[in-house]
Amino acid sequence: MLALLSGSALGLVPSTHWRRFTDLHAGEWRGRWSTLGPDGTLLDEISAAQRLEVAANEDVATNTLIFVSQSVRSDCETCFDSEETKEMPAGSFSADTLPYYICGQGSALGPRVLRSGAMSFEACVRHGDERVRLTAQFAPEPSADGSGAPVSLALGRVTFACEALAPAAAALVPAARDVPLDWDGTWAGGRHTLVAPPSPAAEAVVTAVTGASLALEGAAEATLLALPSRGVSAVLPARILAAQPALLTLSWQPTAGTTLRLEASVEALGRSVVSTESSTVMSPPRLLELTVSELRRE
């Protein structure tokens, strides 16, 4: 039996960190959630929303997922579309248990261990009233003889959520955008970095960037996934090897001349905390470094 300890560097979170988090995520975000397999095959696409409500005068936030169960499109100019939705509570947290890392106009949740034993990592970048979230899962792979601790984590399902703040969602509709990927030229702007090993409340270091090239290619052991019509792409490790840093990259072009890029270095399967003949308990995965670049074409 394998168990991965689920842990994160929490503790008291300064009010400034809480404000940065709510400024970035509060509200109801509607859009299209596209789920791809590790080979890039589109597995599912749905209309959904995420609502983060922050209690007045309290450092408490409640998270709710909203799924469209049925929709009816009007066939006349003076009529309205209608839809039925289902809501699913997705937990709550307070300022002193905030697990999000905030870095410029981006954030990261995880890496963390799910009940299934898989590792999950969520990355998000925001531009105006729009954002893109990426959630990637990695499943443990056993050793060659099937005994002992796993030697790697294999990339599984990946979900891109292209969303806009309600009520602006009707006007923005990220899923209908046509912003093909275009990395040509050089780029300049700012880069926010949380140095290793960051705590959720850490302050990002800001540096200027000029003459940067944004060519995005998958490495030999990496997978390039993209939604070209929405200007979204990601380079993810096909496998995360035990105790070796792995780089996850999310890029988004909300306009032809604007790019947001989030790069996260993570580590998993670090060391065996407890190991017996029947079970192995591994140290939790951790975020080593987080960088968010906000760039414009020169």
Predicted regions: what is each one?
Residues 1-12:
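N-terminal chloroplast transit peptides
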Residues 14-298:
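Soluble ligand-binding/transfer domains with enclosed cavities or grooves
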